Amino acid sequence: SFLVVHTVYVGLVRPNAEAVLEAERQAIAAQQESGETVTIERSAWVVLKDYDQEACFILMFWVMAIMGLKAQAVGAQLNLLNQSLVKIEEGRRVLPEDARKLARPLEALPQPERGFLLPRALRAALNRYGSTASVADVSSVVRDLCDTEADRLDSELSMVRYITWAIPSIGFIGTVRGIGTALGNAHEAVAGNISAVTASLGVAFNSTFVALLISIVIMFLTHQITLMQERMVMETQDYCDYNL
């Protein structure tokens, strides 16, 4: 993501931003000579041009790649719920000695399906039933395994949450940097040249603006991937309860 975003910034964003700023400087110079008022429109290139915004976009695409891989993995596990992994005829009573035979198709699954939550939960349930012949123990082992998987999936989102926190923080760093630069150029504003001060204030507000917009998008995607993971765990538990 770093190479792609940096290439776009070097080849597209910053050259266009410099062209827009040069046009603005010429318009202001013409305004001072003629005394006419010139309206300067806000440009997206100028809003995006600084290094703070570039860092935010790099983090955004990085975290989106992480969530994309997680969404793909969860989707594969949800698709597995539509298959009949344990074939038990309706009305048939399953005996403890049948558990080993029923678990063989689960052990024959290819990777990575064999490591998915549903096959692991079914294997654990059948193994527990084969050793204890207790339905209560079967329900307990499925529930414990699903709870452990939910905790693991939640902990794996810690990097996503950290990046979601870091993006607006980078925006605020840009704000502090821009305001500090503006204060350093305050003597020029006193002399009548406010262009340096306004440019620095633009850096300050643009960085926060872009960072907050990106943060809103990332928070929404994080919420969606969390819902997908919770749904997968709950449907796996329901699948085991219904089919066993």
Which residues are covered by each model-predicted region?
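Alpha-helical transmembrane segments of integral membrane proteins
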Residues: K49-L59, R161-I167, G202
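Channel- or pocket-lining gating/hinge segments that regulate access to a cavity or pore
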Residues: G192-L244
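Peri-membrane helix termini and adjoining interfacial loops of integral membrane proteins
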Residues: I28-E36, G180-S195
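Juxtamembrane "helix exit" motif at the C-terminal ends of alpha-helical transmembrane segments
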Residues: F2-A19, L69-K70, I170-V190
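Membrane-interface, cytosolic juxtamembrane amphipathic helix immediately N-terminal to a transmembrane helix
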Residues: T39-E41, W45, A133-I167, A191-A199, ...
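Membrane-spanning helices that line or support transport/gating and their immediate boundary helices
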Residues: P15, M67-L78, A182-N185, I216, ...
